[in-house]
Amino acid sequence: MDTALPSVLIGGGLSVSVSISTATKAGSQSISSHLSTSSLRLTARHRNRRRLPLLASSSESPPAQLAAASTESQSRSSRWVVVMDTPPAAAGGSGVSRAEAVDYYAATLAQVVGSEKEAQMRICEASWDGTYEFRCEIDEDASKELAKMPGVLSVQLDMGNKSEKDNHSLSLSTANLVSISDGASTSSSGKNEFWLVRMEKPGVEVVTKAQMVDHYTQILMKVLGNEQDAQVSIYHVSWDRDYGFCCHIDEECAKELADVPGVLSVQPDTNFGSDNKNYKGDDGVKSSEGTGAVDIKTKRLFVTGLSFYTSEKTLRAAFEPFGELVEVKIIMDRISKRSKGYAFVEYTTEEAGGAALKAMNGQIINGWMIVVDVAKTRSRDRLSGGSNQAFRPHYQAR
Protein backbone atom coordinates (compact mmCIF):
# COMPACT_ATOMS: atom_id res chain seq x y z
CA MET A 1 0.00 0.00 0.00
CA ASP A 2 1.43 3.36 -1.02
CA THR A 3 1.09 6.59 0.87
CA ALA A 4 0.93 9.60 -1.41
CA LEU A 5 2.91 12.69 -0.60
CA PRO A 6 2.19 16.20 -1.91
CA SER A 7 3.02 16.93 -5.51
CA VAL A 8 6.29 18.62 -6.43
CA LEU A 9 6.48 21.36 -9.04
CA ILE A 10 9.51 20.87 -11.28
CA GLY A 11 11.01 23.70 -13.34
CA GLY A 12 8.94 24.19 -16.47
CA GLY A 13 5.64 23.74 -14.65
CA LEU A 14 5.64 19.91 -14.62
CA SER A 15 3.84 18.52 -11.57
CA VAL A 16 4.89 15.10 -10.29
CA SER A 17 3.83 13.00 -7.35
CA VAL A 18 6.01 11.08 -4.91
CA SER A 19 4.89 8.02 -2.98
CA ILE A 20 6.41 5.92 -0.22
CA SER A 21 5.75 2.21 -0.27
CA THR A 22 4.76 0.87 3.15
CA ALA A 23 5.43 -2.67 2.03
CA THR A 24 9.12 -2.10 1.44
CA LYS A 25 11.82 -2.21 4.07
CA ALA A 26 12.03 0.71 6.49
CA GLY A 27 13.59 3.74 4.87
CA SER A 28 13.11 2.58 1.26
CA GLN A 29 11.16 4.82 -1.11
CA SER A 30 9.52 4.34 -4.45
CA ILE A 31 9.37 7.44 -6.62
CA SER A 32 6.93 7.97 -9.44
CA SER A 33 8.45 7.43 -12.86
CA HIS A 34 7.30 10.93 -13.79
CA LEU A 35 10.16 12.34 -11.72
CA SER A 36 13.19 12.75 -13.97
CA THR A 37 16.63 11.38 -13.10
CA SER A 38 18.10 14.88 -13.33
CA SER A 39 15.81 16.02 -10.55
CA LEU A 40 16.88 13.17 -8.26
CA ARG A 41 20.43 14.50 -8.14
CA LEU A 42 19.16 17.40 -6.05
CA THR A 43 18.71 15.22 -2.96
CA ALA A 44 22.40 14.57 -2.37
CA ARG A 45 23.17 18.26 -2.66
CA HIS A 46 21.01 19.11 0.34
CA ARG A 47 23.41 17.60 2.87
CA ASN A 48 26.10 20.31 3.09
CA ARG A 49 24.98 23.89 2.83
CA ARG A 50 25.23 27.25 4.50
CA ARG A 51 21.99 28.87 5.48
CA LEU A 52 20.93 32.48 5.69
CA PRO A 53 18.24 32.64 8.33
CA LEU A 54 16.12 35.75 8.49
CA LEU A 55 15.08 35.97 12.08
CA ALA A 56 12.68 38.06 14.14
CA SER A 57 12.03 38.06 17.85
CA SER A 58 8.58 36.91 18.80
CA SER A 59 8.44 39.32 21.72
CA GLU A 60 8.62 42.52 19.69
CA SER A 61 4.84 42.95 19.34
CA PRO A 62 1.84 42.12 21.50
CA PRO A 63 1.01 38.38 21.21
CA ALA A 64 -2.58 39.03 20.15
CA GLN A 65 -1.51 41.27 17.29
CA LEU A 66 1.17 38.84 16.18
CA ALA A 67 -1.22 35.91 16.26
CA ALA A 68 -3.78 37.82 14.20
CA ALA A 69 -1.18 38.92 11.67
CA SER A 70 0.18 35.39 11.44
CA THR A 71 -3.27 33.91 10.83
CA GLU A 72 -4.07 36.48 8.15
CA SER A 73 -0.76 35.92 6.39
CA GLN A 74 -1.09 32.13 6.43
CA SER A 75 -4.55 32.34 4.88
CA ARG A 76 -3.02 33.97 1.83
CA SER A 77 0.27 32.13 1.41
CA SER A 78 2.32 29.09 2.32
CA ARG A 79 6.03 28.45 2.58
CA TRP A 80 7.74 26.87 -0.43
CA VAL A 81 11.19 25.38 -1.00
CA VAL A 82 12.63 26.54 -4.33
CA VAL A 83 15.61 24.65 -5.73
CA MET A 84 17.60 26.63 -8.28
CA ASP A 85 20.06 25.82 -11.01
CA THR A 86 23.69 26.81 -10.49
CA PRO A 87 24.10 30.61 -10.73
CA PRO A 88 26.05 31.89 -13.76
CA ALA A 89 28.95 33.04 -11.57
CA ALA A 90 29.38 29.56 -10.05
CA ALA A 91 29.04 27.89 -13.44
CA GLY A 92 32.00 29.95 -14.63
CA GLY A 93 34.21 28.40 -11.97
CA SER A 94 34.14 31.11 -9.31
CA GLY A 95 32.35 30.83 -5.99
CA VAL A 96 29.07 32.54 -5.19
CA SER A 97 28.84 34.92 -2.24
CA ARG A 98 25.80 35.34 -0.03
CA ALA A 99 25.02 38.66 -1.71
CA GLU A 100 25.20 37.17 -5.20
CA ALA A 101 22.99 34.25 -4.20
CA VAL A 102 20.34 36.50 -2.64
CA ASP A 103 20.38 38.71 -5.74
CA TYR A 104 19.96 35.64 -7.93
CA TYR A 105 17.01 34.35 -5.92
CA ALA A 106 15.36 37.76 -5.58
CA ALA A 107 15.63 38.47 -9.31
CA THR A 108 13.95 35.15 -10.08
CA LEU A 109 11.17 35.57 -7.53
CA ALA A 110 10.61 39.18 -8.64
CA GLN A 111 9.30 37.91 -11.98
CA VAL A 112 6.39 36.41 -10.05
CA VAL A 113 5.73 38.87 -7.21
CA GLY A 114 6.35 42.06 -9.21
CA SER A 115 9.49 43.64 -7.76
CA GLU A 116 12.85 42.69 -6.29
CA LYS A 117 12.03 44.54 -3.08
CA GLU A 118 8.87 42.49 -2.60
CA ALA A 119 10.77 39.32 -3.53
CA GLN A 120 13.53 39.99 -1.02
CA MET A 121 10.98 40.51 1.75
CA ARG A 122 9.28 37.20 0.94
CA ILE A 123 12.51 35.16 1.07
CA CYS A 124 12.90 33.76 4.60
CA GLU A 125 15.89 31.42 4.17
CA ALA A 126 18.59 30.89 1.57
CA SER A 127 21.36 28.36 0.90
CA TRP A 128 24.31 29.10 -1.34
CA ASP A 129 27.00 26.49 -0.70
CA GLY A 130 26.67 22.98 -2.09
CA THR A 131 23.08 23.59 -3.10
CA TYR A 132 21.25 26.63 -4.36
CA GLU A 133 17.79 26.96 -2.87
CA PHE A 134 15.62 29.32 -0.89
CA ARG A 135 12.38 29.32 1.04
CA CYS A 136 9.73 31.92 0.37
CA GLU A 137 6.17 32.71 1.37
CA ILE A 138 3.86 32.95 -1.64
CA ASP A 139 0.46 31.58 -2.63
CA GLU A 140 -0.06 28.42 -4.66
CA ASP A 141 -0.73 30.22 -7.95
CA ALA A 142 2.51 32.14 -7.59
CA SER A 143 4.38 28.90 -6.84
CA LYS A 144 3.14 27.42 -10.12
CA GLU A 145 4.31 30.48 -12.01
CA LEU A 146 7.65 30.36 -10.22
CA ALA A 147 8.17 26.76 -11.32
CA LYS A 148 8.09 27.95 -14.94
CA MET A 149 10.84 30.53 -14.48
CA PRO A 150 14.27 29.97 -16.07
CA GLY A 151 16.76 28.51 -13.62
CA VAL A 152 14.11 27.02 -11.32
CA LEU A 153 14.53 23.25 -10.92
CA SER A 154 11.68 22.60 -8.51
CA VAL A 155 9.15 24.28 -6.24
CA GLN A 156 7.90 22.19 -3.35
CA LEU A 157 5.65 22.91 -0.39
CA ASP A 158 7.83 23.15 2.73
CA MET A 159 6.89 19.97 4.57
CA GLY A 160 8.92 21.11 7.57
CA ASN A 161 5.78 22.99 8.60
CA LYS A 162 3.74 20.86 10.95
CA SER A 163 0.46 22.24 9.61
CA GLU A 164 -1.05 25.23 7.87
CA LYS A 165 -2.10 26.57 11.28
CA ASP A 166 1.37 26.23 12.78
CA ASN A 167 3.71 27.73 10.21
CA HIS A 168 7.08 27.27 11.92
CA SER A 169 10.18 28.77 10.42
CA LEU A 170 13.80 29.52 11.14
CA SER A 171 12.57 32.43 13.22
CA LEU A 172 11.35 32.10 16.78
CA SER A 173 7.88 31.05 15.69
CA THR A 174 5.01 33.19 16.97
CA ALA A 175 2.56 30.37 16.29
CA ASN A 176 4.67 28.07 18.45
CA LEU A 177 4.70 30.56 21.32
CA VAL A 178 0.97 31.20 21.18
CA SER A 179 0.18 27.49 21.20
CA ILE A 180 2.22 26.74 24.34
CA SER A 181 1.90 29.93 26.36
CA ASP A 182 -1.67 29.60 27.56
CA GLY A 183 -0.97 28.77 31.19
CA ALA A 184 1.19 26.16 32.83
CA SER A 185 4.80 25.31 32.12
CA THR A 186 4.18 21.63 32.72
CA SER A 187 2.59 18.91 30.63
CA SER A 188 -0.57 16.97 31.46
CA SER A 189 1.64 14.30 33.06
CA GLY A 190 2.90 16.87 35.56
CA LYS A 191 6.47 16.81 34.24
CA ASN A 192 8.19 20.04 33.31
CA GLU A 193 8.69 20.59 29.58
CA PHE A 194 9.94 24.19 29.50
CA TRP A 195 13.60 24.71 30.27
CA LEU A 196 16.07 27.57 30.61
CA VAL A 197 19.52 26.71 29.25
CA ARG A 198 22.54 28.79 30.31
CA MET A 199 25.41 28.78 27.82
CA GLU A 200 29.10 29.64 27.89
CA LYS A 201 30.21 32.88 26.27
CA PRO A 202 31.06 32.34 22.57
CA GLY A 203 34.69 32.44 21.54
CA VAL A 204 34.38 35.48 19.26
CA GLU A 205 33.92 39.13 20.17
CA VAL A 206 31.27 40.17 17.66
CA VAL A 207 28.10 38.06 17.70
CA THR A 208 24.70 38.86 16.21
CA LYS A 209 21.36 37.52 17.33
CA ALA A 210 20.97 35.50 14.13
CA GLN A 211 24.33 33.82 14.68
CA MET A 212 23.48 32.95 18.27
CA VAL A 213 20.09 31.47 17.33
CA ASP A 214 21.90 29.32 14.79
CA HIS A 215 24.41 28.28 17.47
CA TYR A 216 21.68 27.40 19.96
CA THR A 217 19.86 25.40 17.29
CA GLN A 218 22.99 23.34 16.60
CA ILE A 219 23.42 22.68 20.34
CA LEU A 220 19.83 21.49 20.69
CA MET A 221 20.18 19.35 17.55
CA LYS A 222 22.65 17.13 19.39
CA VAL A 223 19.79 16.05 21.64
CA LEU A 224 16.76 16.18 19.36
CA GLY A 225 18.51 14.79 16.28
CA ASN A 226 17.28 17.16 13.58
CA GLU A 227 17.36 20.85 12.84
CA GLN A 228 13.63 21.41 12.31
CA ASP A 229 12.68 20.09 15.75
CA ALA A 230 15.42 22.16 17.35
CA GLN A 231 14.27 25.33 15.60
CA VAL A 232 10.65 25.08 16.67
CA SER A 233 11.51 24.07 20.25
CA ILE A 234 13.34 27.33 21.02
CA TYR A 235 11.00 30.06 22.23
CA HIS A 236 13.33 32.63 23.84
CA VAL A 237 17.00 33.62 23.47
CA SER A 238 19.58 35.75 25.25
CA TRP A 239 22.55 36.71 23.13
CA ASP A 240 24.33 39.87 24.30
CA ARG A 241 25.99 39.77 27.75
CA ASP A 242 24.27 36.70 29.16
CA TYR A 243 24.01 33.70 26.85
CA GLY A 244 21.31 31.07 26.77
CA PHE A 245 17.92 30.05 25.46
CA CYS A 246 14.61 28.56 26.54
CA CYS A 247 13.23 25.47 24.87
CA HIS A 248 10.24 23.13 24.95
CA ILE A 249 11.59 19.58 25.42
CA ASP A 250 10.93 16.62 27.71
CA GLU A 251 12.87 15.88 30.89
CA GLU A 252 15.03 13.13 29.39
CA CYS A 253 16.21 15.46 26.63
CA ALA A 254 16.90 18.14 29.23
CA LYS A 255 19.19 15.76 31.12
CA GLU A 256 21.08 14.93 27.92
CA LEU A 257 21.33 18.60 27.02
CA ALA A 258 23.04 19.37 30.34
CA ASP A 259 25.96 17.13 29.26
CA VAL A 260 26.51 18.87 25.91
CA PRO A 261 29.78 20.87 25.76
CA GLY A 262 29.18 24.59 26.14
CA VAL A 263 26.04 24.16 28.27
CA LEU A 264 26.47 25.56 31.79
CA SER A 265 23.13 24.44 33.22
CA VAL A 266 19.61 23.32 32.31
CA GLN A 267 16.86 24.25 34.75
CA PRO A 268 13.07 24.65 34.64
CA ASP A 269 11.87 27.93 33.18
CA THR A 270 10.16 29.25 36.30
CA ASN A 271 9.31 32.53 34.59
CA PHE A 272 7.58 31.03 31.57
CA GLY A 273 5.46 33.50 29.61
CA SER A 274 7.67 36.47 30.51
CA ASP A 275 10.73 37.98 28.83
CA ASN A 276 12.45 38.25 32.22
CA LYS A 277 14.77 35.25 32.34
CA ASN A 278 17.56 34.45 34.79
CA TYR A 279 20.37 33.70 32.33
CA LYS A 280 22.89 35.08 34.85
CA GLY A 281 22.28 32.19 37.22
CA ASP A 282 22.30 33.42 40.81
CA ASP A 283 22.98 37.03 39.85
CA GLY A 284 19.32 37.93 39.48
CA VAL A 285 16.57 38.05 36.90
CA LYS A 286 16.86 40.41 33.97
CA SER A 287 15.30 40.97 30.60
CA SER A 288 17.52 39.54 27.88
CA GLU A 289 15.78 41.52 25.18
CA GLY A 290 16.97 44.76 26.73
CA THR A 291 20.49 43.54 27.48
CA GLY A 292 23.15 46.11 26.77
CA ALA A 293 20.67 48.84 25.78
CA VAL A 294 19.54 50.18 29.19
CA ASP A 295 21.03 53.49 30.39
CA ILE A 296 23.63 53.51 27.62
CA LYS A 297 24.36 56.99 26.32
CA THR A 298 25.88 57.33 22.88
CA LYS A 299 25.43 59.57 19.89
CA ARG A 300 26.73 57.14 17.29
CA LEU A 301 25.24 53.71 16.54
CA PHE A 302 26.47 50.77 14.49
CA VAL A 303 23.70 48.93 12.62
CA THR A 304 24.22 45.45 11.12
CA GLY A 305 21.97 42.87 9.47
CA LEU A 306 20.62 45.30 6.88
CA SER A 307 18.96 44.07 3.72
CA PHE A 308 21.00 44.82 0.62
CA TYR A 309 17.95 46.71 -0.64
CA THR A 310 17.62 49.06 2.34
CA SER A 311 18.36 52.66 1.38
CA GLU A 312 19.68 55.46 3.56
CA LYS A 313 16.29 57.15 3.18
CA THR A 314 14.52 54.08 4.61
CA LEU A 315 17.05 53.77 7.43
CA ARG A 316 16.73 57.46 8.27
CA ALA A 317 12.94 57.18 8.44
CA ALA A 318 13.27 54.30 10.91
CA PHE A 319 15.66 56.14 13.26
CA GLU A 320 14.34 59.72 13.00
CA PRO A 321 11.56 59.33 15.60
CA PHE A 322 14.15 59.16 18.40
CA GLY A 323 15.80 62.52 17.80
CA GLU A 324 17.62 64.81 15.39
CA LEU A 325 20.07 62.97 13.18
CA VAL A 326 23.53 64.16 12.18
CA GLU A 327 24.32 61.33 9.78
CA VAL A 328 22.93 58.11 8.34
CA LYS A 329 25.55 56.27 6.32
CA ILE A 330 25.25 52.83 4.74
CA ILE A 331 28.67 51.36 3.97
CA MET A 332 29.03 50.38 0.31
CA ASP A 333 31.43 47.96 -1.34
CA ARG A 334 33.86 49.89 -3.53
CA ILE A 335 33.91 47.29 -6.27
CA SER A 336 30.31 46.09 -6.52
CA LYS A 337 28.84 49.46 -5.41
CA ARG A 338 26.31 47.61 -3.27
CA SER A 339 25.56 47.72 0.44
CA LYS A 340 27.75 45.66 2.76
CA GLY A 341 24.77 45.19 5.06
CA TYR A 342 25.81 47.59 7.82
CA ALA A 343 25.58 51.30 8.54
CA PHE A 344 26.29 54.11 11.00
CA VAL A 345 23.63 56.34 12.54
CA GLU A 346 24.61 59.44 14.51
CA TYR A 347 22.38 61.69 16.65
CA THR A 348 22.91 65.19 18.02
CA THR A 349 22.36 63.99 21.61
CA GLU A 350 23.35 60.94 23.63
CA GLU A 351 19.82 60.60 24.98
CA ALA A 352 18.44 60.14 21.46
CA GLY A 353 21.14 57.61 20.61
CA GLY A 354 20.49 55.61 23.77
CA ALA A 355 16.75 55.56 23.15
CA ALA A 356 17.25 54.37 19.56
CA LEU A 357 19.70 51.69 20.69
CA LYS A 358 17.19 50.29 23.15
CA ALA A 359 14.18 50.47 20.84
CA MET A 360 15.61 49.54 17.44
CA ASN A 361 17.80 46.57 18.34
CA GLY A 362 16.12 43.48 16.86
CA GLN A 363 13.58 45.39 14.77
CA ILE A 364 12.67 44.42 11.21
CA ILE A 365 13.54 46.64 8.24
CA ASN A 366 12.70 45.43 4.73
CA GLY A 367 12.15 41.93 6.05
CA TRP A 368 15.52 41.62 7.80
CA MET A 369 16.18 41.83 11.53
CA ILE A 370 18.74 44.50 12.34
CA VAL A 371 21.22 44.52 15.21
CA VAL A 372 22.05 47.90 16.77
CA ASP A 373 25.18 48.46 18.85
CA VAL A 374 27.33 51.32 20.08
CA ALA A 375 29.77 52.49 17.41
CA LYS A 376 33.22 52.19 19.00
CA THR A 377 35.20 54.57 16.80
CA ARG A 378 34.68 56.33 13.50
CA SER A 379 37.49 54.25 12.00
CA ARG A 380 35.05 51.36 11.79
CA ASP A 381 33.68 52.98 8.60
CA ARG A 382 36.84 51.85 6.89
CA LEU A 383 36.72 48.24 8.01
CA SER A 384 36.21 45.67 5.27
CA GLY A 385 33.40 43.85 6.97
CA GLY A 386 35.06 42.58 10.15
CA SER A 387 31.90 43.37 12.08
CA ASN A 388 30.09 40.72 10.07
CA GLN A 389 32.48 38.05 11.32
CA ALA A 390 30.60 34.75 11.27
CA PHE A 391 30.26 32.76 14.46
CA ARG A 392 30.61 29.08 13.62
CA PRO A 393 30.47 26.78 16.67
CA HIS A 394 32.24 23.45 16.51
CA TYR A 395 29.74 20.66 16.13
CA GLN A 396 29.58 17.32 14.41
CA ALA A 397 28.49 17.52 10.80
CA ARG A 398 25.40 15.60 9.89
Swiss-Prot record:
SUPFAM superfamilies: RNA-binding domain, RBD. Residues 54-79 are annotated as: Disordered. It is found in: Plastid, Chloroplast. Residues 54-70 have a biased composition (Low complexity). It holds the Pfam family RRM_1. One of its GO terms (cellular component) is mitochondrion. Its main location: plastid. The keyword Plastid applies. It comes from the Eukaryota. InterPro entries: MORF/ORRM1/DAG-like, MORF/ORRM1/DAG-like_MORF, Nucleotide-bd_a/b_plait_sf, RBD_domain_sf, RRM_dom, S8pro/Inhibitor_I9_sf. Residues 299-377 form the RRM domain. Keywords: Chloroplast, mRNA processing, Plastid, RNA-binding, Transit peptide. The keyword Nucleotide-binding does not apply. Disruption phenotype: Pale-green leaf phenotype. One of its GO terms (biological process) is cytidine to uridine editing. One of its GO terms (molecular function) is RNA binding. Residues 1-88 form a transit peptide. Involved in C-to-U editing of chloroplastic RNA. Functions as major chloroplastic editing factor. Controls a majority of the chloroplastic editing sites. This is Organelle RRM domain-containing protein 1, chloroplastic. It comes from Zea mays (Maize).
